[in-house]
Amino acid sequence: MQKHKLISLVLLLLYWLCPAQVPRFEPVGGNTLWMTKSGEEYLNRLLQDIDAARTTIEMEYYWFDADKAGKLVRDALVKKAREGVKIRILVDNFITPGSPEFYFEQMRREGMQVAYVHNLEKMCPGKAVASFFGYRDHRKIVVIDGRIAYTGGINFNNQTIYVWKDTQVRIEGPAAAQMRALFEQGWADLADGSPAPEIPVEPVGTALVQTVGTVSRDTTLTHLYVQKLAEAKEYFYLQTPYFGPPPQVLQALKDAAARGVDVRLLFPEKCDWGFMNSLTRDYIPELIASGIRVFVFNGVYDHSKLFVSDDRIASCGTVNLDGRSFHTNWEDALLFHDRESALQVKESYLNVQAECIEMDASYPQAKGLSKAWRKFLRKIYRIL
């Protein structure tokens, strides 16, 4: 255990030697919101928007495979590049080993700019060492012509497009410029070239939207969740594929329930990470004892990451309720500050909850794990 702690502390020190900056944004009105639970529906809508692009396309993506889904996106991009659209792609090359170098080299030959998150030539020494052992660019950003933006949990691969359930949101309007500015932060850190000029965006709707972006060592998400839980008066519904929150967020969930807020958590019965199955199960009796209602989905794996509270605030993005998302990875989320958008997210949550089983106090903790081992799992996951 001491060895793991030492390694983690060394990595954290290396992060601190290479500070990163991320822009902060205020809520902006004049947007429209569209959301889907279907990977295929997302892909079809995205391909339509790509086909209609006139000037620029930016993508910052965690996972971009060279399979059927990935090639559909690539082919659409190739077509637009040949038409003169400026395309920039930032991809986490650590998590996309299924896409060989020539796959992205083909994109470069078509005139696209492709940069890797773990670009050792662009990193300071500390960050270069830490990158392969620590942070991932978990963002899933697409911005088209500076006025349309997408984010959510869906990657460009067959599994997340055609098999899993997930939530993806599309905004159109001035808030898309915030997502583009967040992309520019990563691009400036890891790629060559000056930032693209800003594109004026006219209001097209009524949604009040705020972009939230984080980098390693950032405390933004912890403060955000603690604040929104403290502000909740009637309910706070949260869906996440993984549950291993920072202590402050776990306590904020319990405190809200103790005040009489209807706090509900929803996650899959089994996730794609066996380690996280054990960790998530370990929390369930503790959550129920604190007055939090826990719902488990046992159908097709649902990878959604969202919350909604009091019909007034909601969020959807790439953020899992775990230590990596809150402290280590690069993440993004959209906050919706208007009632209409919050109700859309609420409806999505309740539709999934209707297919869930509510857990009770008899739910067993992770089988086969001693108390000491469960405690160790919690601690090590918060650190890494």
What residue spans do the PLM features occupy?
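Bacterial N-terminal signal peptides that target proteins for export
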Residues: 1-7
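Bacterial N-terminal signal peptides
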Residues: 8-16
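Charged, low-complexity intrinsically disordered terminal segments
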Residues: 4, 16-384
